[in-house]
Swiss-Prot record:
Keywords: ATP synthesis, Cell inner membrane, Cell membrane, CF(1), Hydrogen ion transport, Ion transport, Membrane, Transport. The gene is atpH. One of its GO terms (molecular function) is proton-transporting ATP synthase activity, rotational mechanism. F(1)F(0) ATP synthase produces ATP from ADP in the presence of a proton or sodium gradient. F-type ATPases consist of two structural domains, F(1) containing the extramembraneous catalytic core and F(0) containing the membrane proton channel, linked together by a central stalk and a peripheral stalk. During catalysis, ATP synthesis in the catalytic domain of F(1) is coupled via a rotary mechanism of the central stalk subunits to proton translocation. It comes from Paraburkholderia phymatum (strain DSM 17167 / CIP 108236 / LMG 21445 / STM815). Belongs to the ATPase delta chain family. This is ATP synthase subunit delta. It is found in: Cell inner membrane. Coiled coil: none annotated. InterPro entries: ATP_synth_OSCP/delta_N_sf, ATPase_OSCP/dsu. Pfam families: OSCP. F-type ATPases have 2 components, F(1) - the catalytic core - and F(0) - the membrane proton channel. F(1) has five subunits: alpha(3), beta(3), gamma(1), delta(1), epsilon(1). F(0) has three main subunits: a(1), b(2) and c(10-14). The alpha and beta chains form an alternating ring which encloses part of the gamma chain. F(1) is attached to F(0) by a central stalk formed by the gamma and epsilon chains, while a peripheral stalk is formed by the delta and b chains.
Length: 179
C-alpha cells in the first residue's frame, strides 16, 4: 500500500499543478471518474491484454467518463502516460492523493462518521458543525452505520480518531476494571 502511494504521489502532485491553472473541481471529477473505471476488473484485464493497443485502452478509458475535461489535451496525455507505463492500477490512489491535496488547499478534510444509527438532516448538520469547531477545519462528511457501536459515534479525520461510542466506553471500563 505504501509503495502504491509513493509511486502515485508524483502523478497526483503534477495533476494538481495542472488543475490549479484551471478548474480544480472539474479535474477532481475527472480523476474520480477515471479511478472508478480503473477499478473495474474488466478494464484491468483489457488493459493487460496484448491484443489491445495502448491507444485503444486510452480511448476506452476516456470514453467511459462523463467529464467534459476528457477531451482536454492534458487529460488525454495523463491517461496515455498511465497506459504506456502500465500504471492504470494507480488511478484510485492518484485520485485519493489528489483529493487530499485539494482538501489541504481548501483547508478542509474528509471525515468518516460511523454511527450506531442513521444520521440525517439537522442531526447530521449539528454534529458536523460541532466537529468542525473541534477539528478547526471544514469537514466533508461520509456517514456509515455500524450497529455494533451500540450508541454514539466514531469519527475519523485524517489520522485523528474521536470515539465516543458506547462500545469504546465499555471497552475502557473493562480495561480499567481488569487492570
Amino acid at each position: 500500500m505504501a509503495e502504491l502511494a509513493t509511486i502515485a504521489r508524483p502523478y497526483a502532485e503534477a495533476l494538481f499543478g495542472v488543475a490549479e491553472a484551471g478548474d480544480i473541481a472539474a479535474w477532481s471529477t475527472l480523476v474520480q471518474e477515471l479511478a472508478q473505471v480503473a477499478r473495474l476488473p474488466d478494464v484491468l484485464s483489457i488493459a493487460s491484454s496484448p491484443k489491445v493497443s495502448r491507444a485503444q485502452i486510452s480511448d476506452l478509458l476516456l470514453a467511459a467518463v462523463k467529464s467534459p475535461l476528457k477531451d482536454n489535451a492534458q487529460a488525454k496525455n495523463l491517461v496515455q502516460m498511465l497506459v504506456d507505463n502500465h500504471r492504470l492500477p494507480l488511478l484510485p490512489e492518484i485520485a485519493t492523493q489528489f483529493e487530499e491535496l485539494k482538501n489541504a488547499r481548501e483547508g478542509a478534510a474528509d471525515a468518516l462518521i460511523v454511527s450506531a444509527f442513521p444520521l440525517e438532516g439537522a442531526q447530521l448538520d449539528g454534529l458536523v458543525a460541532s466537529l468542525e469547531r473541534k477539528f478547526k477545519r471544514k469537514l466533508k462528511p461520509t456517514v456509515q452505520v455500524d450497529s455494533s457501536l451500540i450508541g454514539g459515534v466514531r469519527v475519523t479525520v485524517g489520522d485523528e480518531v474521536l470515539d465516543t461510542s458506547v462500545r469504546a466506553r465499555l471497552a475502557s471500563m473493562q480495561t480499567a476494571l481488569t487492570a
